[in-house]
């Protein structure tokens, strides 16, 4: 009957509306639908294994996998630009990059330049020395020549603690390690995970048992870009809850 047909049509319409609402809810949970179908540009410095490094022509690592997972969660695509570490924040500030993921530590100074997401990993600054070094503690670093990657927290902390005259800056962590191996400097201060990689790959080096500083890694976005920041934070929360974040880290870092 016509009345029955109208009721059926109304029921089908209600089902469609419910399905649309469910899809909308899922999109909201997955981040911000405003970024669905868009390409987001990430700025990084691919000299920081296992967080970001070159594998042939590809840039891979923990940050890359996390960024891909975040973009997938938001329905967006990811494009990566590889720049010098101290160029990353200017890239984000100028809008050349939408966000930065580069094993970047949250510091008070950086918080005046960019907005940071929730923490997705923690790091420790470590000291690399040669196996025959007379440096056995942090106090022994006084008066020594310390190599750092320019613009990193290792650079910041070393300069603050030991003075400008004690710090030699390199564009790449690997260059600092090479200078240590050839006797041009006495120690290298860099994040623990890359430090472990450098020690494993270069004979005659070791890590001091005492960590230099502990810190938190987060994603940087342009100041005031709350829409993207909220979407990234929602995706980070989803990755933590699903266990995906731990899976990504475990893929690159085995338990010690």
Enumerate the predicted regions with their spans.
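Short, low-complexity disordered leader/linker segments with a strong preference
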Residues: 1-39, 256
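Ligand-binding clefts/hinges and TM-proximal coupling segments of bilobed small-molecule sensing domains
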Residues: 29-32, 77, 153-170, 203-211, ...
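Extracytoplasmic small-molecule ligand-binding "clamshell" domains
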Residues: 29-103
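Periplasmic-binding protein-like
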Residues: 46, 121-129, 196-237, 253-256
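Short helix-initiation/N-cap motifs at beta->coil->alpha
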Residues: 65, 79-92, 133, 150-153, ...
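Alpha-to-beta junction loops
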Residues: 75-77, 93-102, 144-145, 172, ...
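A ligand-binding cleft/hinge motif common to bilobed small-molecule-binding domains
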Residues: 87, 104-112, 157-160, 181-182, ...
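Flexible hinge/capping segments at coil-to-helix
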Residues: 129-146
